[in-house]
Design a protein with these regions (language model features):
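Non-catalytic interaction/Regulatory regions outside core domains
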Residues: 1-111
Length: 111
């Protein structure tokens, strides 16, 4: 959360969608209900799995950015067995956030 003030929410889950960590920025109003949030995460995990089936031909996915009117959603690998799911304000610098998450994941892999 301290990475960028435009981050609304961060969730880390395994590749089956089991939530390992989740937090919202203080003062952020949820746009989705709890059930809708779980469904959105489930859809993102399933979409990531589908894309991963092509990795042997096109390479491993680095990230997916969904740009909506009210938020941006970033889904990307966090190590070999987890995904990070981040929502931001629309004006967020997603390239910076993606770069920082990639660096953090790499430092954890090398620890």
């Amino acid at each position: 959360m301290s990475l960028d003030r435009n981050i609304r929410m961060v969730t880390i889950c395994d590749t089956d969608g089991k939530i390992m960590y989740s937090d919202h920025r203080p003062g952020v109003t949820n746009l989705l209900t709890s059930d809708e949030s779980r469904k959105s995460l489930e859809m993102a995990v399933n979409a990531w799995k589908s894309r991963s089936q092509l990795a042997s031909k096109i390479g491993k996915g680095k990230y997916v950015l969904a740009d909506y009117e009210k938020i941006k959603r970033i889904t990307m690998p966090f190590g070999d067995t987890h995904l990070v799911y981040v929502t931001t304000e629309p004006q967020a610098n997603h390239a910076y956030i993606i770069s920082e998450i990639t660096s953090l994941a790499s430092s954890l892999d090398n620890a």
